[in-house]
């Protein structure tokens, strides 16, 4: 991976770099030589420390818990920036994480190609949590991830509208008037914590859907509580299991889909009422 790539380069000859450029009109001039301008990467990297220090009064703002960067600027951040910090006697970031690219139909996003997707455009189409799901679910943590509006639309309808949204609506409608007590509050699954800590957001979401949402859907379809009388204890038992699973799903979704998590927990607390509208309407 990226770690091996950098370690391999460091084992070969690493040459000194010049921290200034000659006859560059824009940039910070070297104080003792006006013909020289500070190399843009040198002054830009300092901002991680200096700019953050300017806007916070917290003493523990440094070192960074995690330094997130794109793969094309790996060398500058994992070698040059680290060397600068060591030279200044400052702590290194606790972790550096390098991600790959979001691609549009196999091509890099480019203003000249006009294939850029803006977060605002996504939020208008899919809502804020819908967009968070689509972006996190396609997160290019190891390899480039191919995305596009139509791909996102299909994923949104399949995973959120038809699956999660439909499941929450069905259970809420079937459970009308029911009140389910919770003996202990659900906690975030250790596997989800582990994956989020590794920034494997797509895998974290996959685990949540597999473990809680898909299994609850399958359980509900298998047990068919709608075929049973409303006062049948078996029906109440099936719906109680489904509600508890959805509460667990909501707690696990909170770091990535906070609004959705809140709505699910609100829906299944107290005396349950049917939803007025789906969490994720089809698009």
Predicted segment positions?
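Structured secondary-structure scaffolds
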Residues: 1-177, 181, 208-209
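Short, mixed-charge aromatic SLiMs
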Residues: 102-109, 158-160, 185-191, 269-276
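Basic, alpha-helical terminal appendages of large translation-related enzymes
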Residues: 210-283
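Amphipathic alpha-helical interaction elements
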Residues: 123, 197, 253-254
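Active-site lining segments that contact anionic ligands and/or coordinate catalytic metals
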Residues: 93, 202, 247-248
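Active-site-proximal binding-pocket segments
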Residues: 74, 138, 142, 148-151, ...
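Residue-level recognition of alpha-helical structural elements
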Residues: 2-3, 153, 160, 201-204, ...
């Amino acid at each position: 991976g990226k770690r091996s790539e950098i370690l391999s380069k460091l084992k070969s000859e690493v040459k000194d770099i010049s921290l200034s450029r000659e006859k560059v009109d824009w940039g910070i001039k070297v104080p003792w030589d006006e013909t020289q301008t500070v190399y843009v990467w040198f002054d830009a990297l300092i901002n991680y420390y200096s700019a953050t220090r300017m806007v916070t009064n917290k003493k523990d703002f440094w070192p960074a818990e995690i330094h997130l960067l794109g793969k094309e600027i790996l060398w500058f951040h994992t070698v040059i920036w680290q060397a600068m910090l060591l030279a200044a006697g400052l702590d290194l970031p606790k972790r550096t994480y390098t991600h790959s690219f979001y691609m549009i139909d196999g091509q890099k996003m480019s203003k000249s190609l006009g294939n850029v997707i803006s977060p605002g455009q996504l939020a208008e189409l899919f809502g804020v949590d819908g967009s968070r799901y689509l972006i996190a679910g396609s997160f290019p943590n190891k390899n480039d991830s191919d995305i596009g509006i139509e791909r996102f639309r299909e994923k949104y309808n399949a995973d959120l509208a038809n699956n999660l949204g439909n499941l929450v609506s069905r259970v809420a409608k079937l459970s009308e008037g029911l009140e389910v007590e919770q003996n202990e509050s659900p906690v975030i699954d250790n596997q989800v914590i582990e994956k989020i800590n590794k920034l494997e957001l797509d895998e974290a979401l996959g685990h949540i859907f597999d473990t809680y949402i898909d299994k609850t859907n399958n359980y509900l379809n298998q047990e068919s509580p709608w075929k049973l009388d409303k006062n049948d204890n078996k029906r109440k038992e099936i719906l109680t299991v489904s509600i508890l699973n959805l509460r667990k799903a909501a707690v696990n979704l909170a770091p990535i889909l906070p609004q959705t998590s809140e709505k699910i927990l609100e829906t299944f607390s107290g005396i349950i009422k049917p939803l007025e509208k789906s969490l994720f309407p089809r698009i």
